[in-house]
Amino acid sequence: MGVIDNKEQRSLDEINSTIEFNDSQRTSQKFLAFLGPGLLVAVGYMDPGNWITSMQGGAQFGYTLLFVILISSLSAMLLQSMTVRLGIATDKDLAQMTRHYLNKPTAIIFWVIAELAIIATDIAEVIGSAIALDLLFNIPLIIGALITVFDVFLLLFIMKFGFRKIEAIVGTLIFTVLMIFVFEVYISSPNLIEILNGFVPHYQIIANHSILYIALGIIGATIMPHNLYLHSSIVQSRKYNRHSFTEKAQAIKFATIDSNIQLSIAFIVNCLLLVLGAALFYGVNSNNIGGFYDLYQALRTQPVLGVVMGSIMSTLFAIALLASGQNSTITGTLAGQIVMEGFLKLSIPNWMRRLVTRSLAVIPVLLCLVIFRGNESKMEQLLVFSQVFLSIALPFSLIPLQLATSNEKLMGPFKNKKWVNICAWGLIIILSFLNIYLIIETFKEL
């Protein structure tokens, strides 16, 4: 384990300690000042990579997998609360802390895996955004993918106005996605009794291989490696007394509540996706729900909805997909900066860092489009591959997080409680096993 240098550059230095609040403010006002970072984290739990598994799960198996979404969301809340404590208690992000734990060659391996995970995450956003542009404006996929490169410059422009503006934009886009799916689920008239029953565990989830496979897909796509790096850094954007136990404890409390609130919203969105799939397609034409284009066309031609409402719902679906892709663009590029600076102590101009990350994600998408001549199903298959790689990369983020947050020398009084350690190690073992199983099954079906 390396020696921690407290004089090294702060995590995301341009936003670190930039959001102030007055000590004389009431507790409720201080809490409001801490609302925001959880929004950026919640984006990863409802990105385009999650959409297919949730809607396919509903279309093929009704409401059965709502229980899996619930367990996945509770697990995410636990892990994200650990990253909050790590960031605030140590004033370091997960990338910096991982570097301190490992020797240089091993740290470089972990850095490469983290970078590839961010590129894999970005691939899903590029594909989701490009498909949304095609559905909404008939823009060819290759042009849509190229357009996404310029998203990074939009982020750079917004950053000039402060981190709060980014949080506000992300919050607006999340609210847009949420309202669209609330409306679509309302129109689809789901069975409320069956929805409630879906939150009860069913033995078929394990006994039925097909259900288990989709369940593993939901779990594997829920907890994203880049979110762990991102959250441990952006919680430090609030200006509190770094030497006061009381203020750190309060910061951890507020940031954890913020995280749980926003992840609850992500949980609702994922439930709405599954409910929509179940209400419209379960027992009707569930086998035809394979990708974004299939979902769009199925919504458009759904007999239950009618011509006008089907057109409205399919268009709203595409708008939500575009909003989700743009949201994830913001968080992915920030996570890329955190990983590079944290692992390598390398700081390059923000525009270059973000342009390189996005370009590396766009290249495989463009190659896929050129080689397969714009084949839509191949694009969606590439998205699935990107999610599989995220499953492989996950333990390389979870294990350093658990080791660091259970270390009393690093965390002091903020170290993990015994029950947290038990739950965290249990989650790591179960998630790693399930992800390995998912990878094997994915390659079997190729």
UniProtKB/Swiss-Prot annotation:
Keywords: Cell membrane, Ion transport, Membrane, Symport, Transmembrane, Transmembrane helix, Transport. It is found in: Cell membrane. It is a multi-pass membrane protein. The keyword Transport applies. One of its GO terms (biological process) is iron ion transmembrane transport. InterPro entries: NRAMP_fam. Its main location: membrane. One of its GO terms (molecular function) is symporter activity. One of its GO terms (cellular component) is plasma membrane. The chain crosses the membrane at residues 32-52, 59-79, 107-127, 139-159, 168-188, 205-225, 264-284, 303-323, 355-375, 381-401, 420-440. Pfam families: Nramp (PF01566). Belongs to the NRAMP family. H(+)-stimulated, divalent metal cation uptake system. HAMAP family: NRAMP. This is Divalent metal cation transporter MntH. It comes from Staphylococcus haemolyticus (strain JCSC1435).
